[in-house]
Design a protein with these regions (language model features):
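Solvent-exposed loop/turn and edge beta-strand elements of beta-rich ligand-binding domains
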Residues: 1-313
Length: 313
């Protein structure tokens, strides 16, 4: 008896080979049996959840179990048409489709899809992805009075940084901003996207924004702080970048720190008769009212001598 391997073709192109067992007897007659593979095909189409634009680069796995722990086959990445197909032996009636990785800019779809297989047929599944967006947090800080040192007539005020409510900001698109489908333009460069005012904690948080570069411009400073004189001094840039497929929101943050208003007092001592400036006169600067720290504590009482100064030439 002689054993051989035999390759068969159906002639249809749907399945080119089978496998079987056969034997050859001395009479030269041959008997064999062939078991054809039961093949099934799965096709997945990937689209943007909002624009419905086809998305390339998404990778899916086909699993044997609903928990998607037992991977049967990893599909090729979706092509420019947003599709991927795979053919495999049908060993059970139902498999489960789940996304493994997504195109950059999108959040992973964690849903698993129940796929009913049919021998010799294609089962199609459509899956969408939501693009990742982000939020910008603006913080406002400035100097506040916290203490005083020295003796009466030679007092030095101490300041520290604190959070400020009431600062007003505009957020503009710093560039043309597109949806992550790379087709849909959502903002033109220079578009006003949102206006915000800081709250009691000194912060303001934007709505969900598309990923991209934004310009934050201070419009109004809180009471007791000085706003920048030029737009450049009042402007900061924030870029919302892709934070990965498992992150819900990208985060951007910027802090504006403003100076406190400062004053100077100049006194000129002159002769009553000839308008000549006089050297050596001593002046005192007194508190017109109680001077309090940011927490309300009185640091210098009304009528106290804050500083002495002697006139020069």
């Amino acid at each position: 008896t002689q054993w051989k391997t035999l390759v068969l073709s159906t002639g249809s192109g749907s399945q080119d080979i089978g496998y079987g067992a056969f034997f050859e007897e001395e009479s030269a007659s041959v008997e064999f049996t062939v078991k054809w593979l039961d093949l099934a095909r799965v096709k997945v189409t990937k689209k943007d959840n909002n624009s419905k634009v086809n998305l390339s680069g998404a990778v899916f796995g086909i699993y044997l179990d609903s928990a998607c722990k037992n991977l049967l086959i990893e599909m090729p990445a979706t092509d420019s048409n947003g599709t991927s197909e795979v053919e495999f032996p049908k060993t059970q009636d139902t498999v489960y489709l789940k996304e493994i990785s997504v195109p950059e800019g999108y959040k992973l779809n964690t849903e698993s899809f129940h796929v009913k297989l049919e021998t010799g047929k294609t089962t199609s599944v459509a899956v969408t992805n939501e693009e990742q967006k982000g939020k910008i947090t603006i913080r406002k800080k400035g100097e506040v009075l916290t203490g005083v040192t020295g003796e009466e007539g030679n007092l030095t005020f101490v300041y520290g940084n604190a959070d400020f409510a009431g600062a007003e900001y505009n957020i503009y698109a710093a560039e043309d901003i597109y949806s992550q489908d790379k087709v849909t333009k959502v903002h033109k460069a220079g578009d006003l996207v949102e206006s915000l005012t800081t709250g009691e904690d000194g912060s303001a948080v934007s709505k969900e924004l598309y990923l991209g570069k934004y310009k934050v411009v201070e419009q109004k400073a809180p009471e007791n702080l000085v706003i920048g004189k030029t737009e450049q001094e009042r402007t900061q840039f924030v870029t919302l970048s892709y934070a990965g497929q498992n992150v819900e929101l990208s985060q951007g943050e910027t802090t504006f720190t403003n100076a406190r208003p400062e004053i100077s007092v100049n006194v000129v001592k002159k002769s009553k008769h000839d308008d000549v400036t006089l050297e050596g006169a001593t002046f005192g600067l007194y508190a017109e009212e109680d001077l309090t720290a940011a927490d309300g504590k009185v640091l210098v009482e009304k009528g106290s001598l804050v500083e002495r100064a002697v006139s020069d030439r």
